[in-house]
Swiss-Prot record:
Glutamine amidotransferase type-1 domain segment(s): 295-548
Reaction it catalyzes: UTP + L-glutamine + ATP + H2O = CTP + L-glutamate + ADP + phosphate + 2 H(+); L-glutamine + H2O = L-glutamate + NH4(+); UTP + NH4(+) + ATP = CTP + ADP + phosphate + 2 H(+)
Name of the protein this chain belongs to: CTP synthase
Matches recorded under InterPro entries: Class_I_gatase-like, CTP_synthase, CTP_synthase_N, GATASE, GATase1_CTP_Synthase, P-loop_NTPase
Record GO cellular component, one term: cytosol
Annotated EC: 6.3.4.2
Family per record: Belongs to the CTP synthase family.
EC class: ligase
Gene name linked to the record: pyrG
Organism whose genome encodes this protein: Acidovorax sp. (strain JS42)
Domain of life per record: Bacteria
Keywords tagged on the record: ATP-binding, Glutamine amidotransferase, Ligase, Magnesium, Metal-binding, Nucleotide-binding, Pyrimidine biosynthesis
Binding locations of CTP: 13, 151-153, 191-196, 227
Residues noted as binding ATP in the record, renumbered to the chain: 14-19, 71
Pfam families reported in the protein's UniProt record: CTP_synth_N, GATase
Amino acid sequence: MTKFVFVTGGVVSSLGKGIASASLAAILESRGLKVTLIKLDPYINVDPGTMSPFQHGEVFVTDDGAETDLDLGHYERFIETRMKQANNFTTGRIYQSVLEKERRGDYLGKTVQVIPHVTNEIQEFIKRGAGIGTPDAVDVAICEVGGTVGDIESLPFLEAVRQLSLKLGPNNSAFVHLTYLPWIAAAGELKTKPTQHTVQKLREIGIQPDALLCRALHAVPEEEKEKISLFTNVAEWGVISMWDVDTIYKVPRMLHEQGLDGLICDKLRLNTPPANLKRWDDLVYETEHPRGEVQIAMVGKYVELSDAYKSVNEALKHAGMQSHVRVKITHVDSETISDDNAAQQLAQYDAILVPGGFGSRGVEGKISTARYAREHQVPYLGICLGMQVATIEYARHVAGLQGANSTEFDPATPHPVIALITEWKDEDGTIKTRSENSDLGGTMRLGAQSSDVQPGTLAHSIYGDVVTERHRHRYEANVQYLDRLRSAGLVISALTQREHLTEIVELPQSVHPWFIGVQFHPEFKSTPWSGHPLFNAFIKAAVEHQKPAAKA
């Protein structure tokens, strides 16, 4: 039978529920349990696909094409289980499902209400995410409830998990509550009152936490833990300190040493071997003992919020560990770059990365960035839009196609080397269509798709014969211009297996040591254990470029 752990948060948002949930999952997985994670988001958007990265950080894409919360990226980087659409749902998706059932007459004329219809639907979605009744059923499903206890948006989710816990019966569910202990500098002490109040609010709803994860700058003193235990009705060994650390990969060891996994296994009556966190210890050692450092310029438009490029940042760090170097990432606003100042802005970096994005703002700066990297032999990795701007730059300045552009940025361009694809097939063979007038939500080429890689190319040395990666984009390289670009020397090194759409472009290594653009998003498949072959190769190229002979 699948057991459940429900993770909630109080006092303030952004405490790290995702990291805490993923860390607990990693420890339980090291005990030999099959684990999955589910994220419940209380906002009314159907998914985060149309939300600004400034609002919500990056959109993480799963193999099955779901646009999900960035926490699912943490989940995949911490445990072996791959996430699916069922692992993330929102208030919007719940209401969408309830209303569809109401229109079909599934409720047999009843008045549709939050309780029981919405809360029942939430419970069904949770069970679906845990794979109950299928071969994918897990031993433990950890459900992270987004938002903060006390917010009106979270109430249906909290009521639903309370009811589900009751239905599951004793020893089949546990509650973990993440809270915050502010440090008052003037008084020189941690304050526990907000924690007392948030647990009180949770208990008013009918939920008694089994463990408290107390976020603070430093480890919480024992006397404060005793006080928290007394006023929250949580056993003292269930009051666990979570202090700030310099790498998130220290959190599993931190929680294990304070007995969180033992407490959960005892509550859920799980008889397992002891946790083995050696690979986490090795990972932390690698991050703390680099043998060098490389400087990477990430040129984008959402640079004010690092979470907008969360998976890219993590993939670069993973690749650094594979090459035993620390990767120092500098986010450069593409709006500040032009042909005139690109050298001044970018000369100090060992490699340049242009990540994905949407809209025309800052695009010319990205095109100037690609030109600088091409002309100055700097390793360049373009992801999604980064590939497209590299293609536009090459068309303008090498292929002689003056005014070349994407129809996304200039619908009247004389040379639309990047254009909207109107029909394609998904991995399962489903035909999809779209136009300029299509809704923004759910109308992109999404999820894992495979491409054939041309032998003798840089891409082939990285991927082999076939590459399968995740996608999230509307615009593609225009097939009508591929022959002209090839004639001008651009290598089209990978095409999709069905529509023969461009997936990878590169420069011959006789012309440039390492210049590649990919239409997909490789960052979503990087893990701290092995990195990702494309990012690993990119960081190796940065290390090579750093050598004096390469600079000369």
